[in-house]
């Protein structure tokens, strides 16, 4: 429940800001990933959803790589807010 609450707070703040920003796009992908992950826990043989999840994961990974190259501070803040792991390639 804590993750959902923190995501809701971030989304309310981001709704007033730029929706086209990299941070907002990563936030939306993270929200979709968490929703699909919970769906796949119930429906293990839903292979189309698995494929969609892999696509979204790749898009989020590319955006995170872009953000880490552009601004390390914004990248660190975002992964802390969304409770994501920092990969070794982005350090």
Curated annotation (Swiss-Prot):
Keyword Ribosomal protein carried by entry: yes
Keyword field: Plastid, Ribonucleoprotein, Ribosomal protein
CDD domains from the UniProt entry: Ribosomal_S15p_S13e
Gene3D superfamilies with a match to the protein in the record: S15/NS1, RNA-binding
InterPro entries: Ribosomal_uS15, Ribosomal_uS15_bac-type, uS15_NS1_RNA-bd_sf
Taxonomy, superkingdom: Eukaryota
Keyword Lipid metabolism carried by entry: no
One GO MF term attached to the UniProt entry: structural constituent of ribosome
Annotated localization: Plastid
GO CC terms of this entry: plastid; ribonucleoprotein complex; ribosome
Family statement drawn from the similarity comment of this UniProt entry: Belongs to the universal ribosomal protein uS15 family.
Subunit structure, as described in the record: Part of the 30S ribosomal subunit.
Protein name as it appears in the record: Small ribosomal subunit protein uS15c
Protein's organism: Cuscuta exaltata
Gene (name only): rps15
């Amino acid at each position: 429940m804590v993750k959902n609450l923190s995501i809701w707070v971030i989304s309310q703040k981001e709704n007033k800001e730029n929706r086209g920003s990299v941070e907002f796009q990563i936030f939306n992908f993270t929200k979709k990933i968490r929703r699909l992950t919970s769906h796949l826990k119930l429906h293990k043989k839903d292979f189309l959803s698995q494929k969609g999840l892999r696509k979204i994961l790749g898009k989020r990974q590319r955006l995170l790589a872009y953000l880490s190259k552009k601004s390390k501070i914004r990248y660190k803040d975002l992964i802390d807010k969304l409770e994501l792991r920092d990969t070794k390639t982005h350090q």
